[in-house]
């Protein structure tokens, strides 16, 4: 039984749109509290056309409940699940930075190659977040069996301070939180999904490790070996493309890194990494075995220099003009006149 209950008016003022997808929109917002308290957050809102679909709403709520208990430096934190006039929204940690898609595009625009050690470091931070999520249990100590199922460039963020964050557990599966049509529909981005996903099979945590391997190969090579003209063609490449000797594609990839990539991208589950902890160990040993290696500060300096003076608008800016006036309250949605 609770000691007592606090009833508080929680108000969010939308500042600008950050990102837009097929099912939802993410905004930068100001959370207002008592005595002039203001905190910048990200607000994820369901599109109107999905707001009345019970299964979609159930998954959206399930995502919020699931991620609320995932408190880790490499996972975007969820603060609040709200509903206003039938529109559900999630208030999340605001990351001032870019996703990996924007990060790699900036390298192309500036004719730069991402240093090998930083590529490995980024994926090692993703592996840290996955290791935590995969091991998460409920209050009774029972494993939740979390599988992200969409480890991809758009769902990995790098803050300008150098923190790497995994986000969007919207199609994750976990016992008791989200409805699951696994085996009936394909979830995830075709060129980042595992062979199990691509062939409509059940997945476990090893599926996320294959996707992490795709991310690492993409960061190193500058392109995704599975990406084709259409999602279906990409899916077929995930299932059939021979995994290359990466040493022949990039002279910076040595024997040890090639072995890590092949183990992560093994189609045979028994030959793939068994856990994110195993992948993390190999990645960290690779970059730190000689002593000093990359840190968040190293990555932060690199990304700030990469985007400095480029005119890029990849990340939320605190100087952006307030462009909408949309106000979200706990049980109220209005647009001021």
Regions found by a protein language model. Give the residues of each.
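C-terminal lobe helix-coil module of Hanks-type protein kinase domains
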Residues: 157, 191-334
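Conserved ATP-binding/catalytic core of the eukaryotic-like protein kinase fold
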Residues: 1-244
């Amino acid at each position: 039984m609770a000691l007592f209950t606090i009833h508080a008016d929680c108000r969010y003022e939308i500042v600008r749109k950050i990102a837009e997808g097929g099912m939802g929109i993410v905004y930068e917002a100001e959370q207002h509290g008592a005595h002039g308290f203001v905190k910048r957050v990200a607000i994820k809102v369901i599109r109107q056309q999905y707001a009345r679909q019970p299964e979609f709403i159930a998954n959206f709520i399930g995502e919020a409940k699931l991620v609320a208990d995932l408190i880790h430096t490499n996972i975007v934190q969820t603060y609040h699940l709200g509903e206003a006039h039938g529109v559900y929204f999630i208030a999340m940690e605001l990351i001032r930075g870019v996703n990996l898609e924007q990060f790699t595009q900036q390298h192309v625009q500036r004719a730069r190659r991402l240093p090998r050690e930083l590529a490995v470091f980024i994926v090692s931070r993703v592996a840290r977040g996955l290791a935590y999520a995969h091991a998460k249990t409920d209050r009774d100590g029972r494993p939740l069996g979390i599988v992200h199922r969409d480890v991809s460039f758009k769902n990995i963020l790098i803050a300008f301070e150098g923190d790497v964050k995994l986000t969007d557990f919207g199609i994750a599966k976990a016992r008791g939180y989200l409805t699951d049509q696994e085996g009936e529909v394909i979830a995830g981005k075709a060129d980042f999904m595992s062979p199990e996903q691509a062939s409509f099979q059940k997945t476990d945590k090893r599926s996320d490790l294959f996707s992490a391997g795709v991310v690492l190969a993409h960061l190193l090579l500058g392109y995704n070996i599975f990406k084709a003209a259409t999602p279906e063609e990409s899916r077929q490449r995930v299932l059939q493309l021979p995994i290359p000797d990466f040493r022949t594609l990039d002279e910076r990839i040595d024997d040890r890194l090639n072995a890590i990539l092949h183990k992560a991208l093994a189609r045979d589950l028994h030959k793939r990494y068994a856990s994110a902890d195993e992948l993390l160990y190999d990645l960290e040993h690779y970059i730190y075995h000689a002593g000093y290696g990359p840190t968040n500060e190293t990555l932060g300096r690199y990304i700030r220099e990469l985007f400095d003076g480029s005119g890029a608008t990849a990340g939320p800016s605190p100087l952006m003009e307030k462009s909408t006036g949309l106000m979200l309250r706990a049980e109220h949605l209005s647009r001021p006149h």
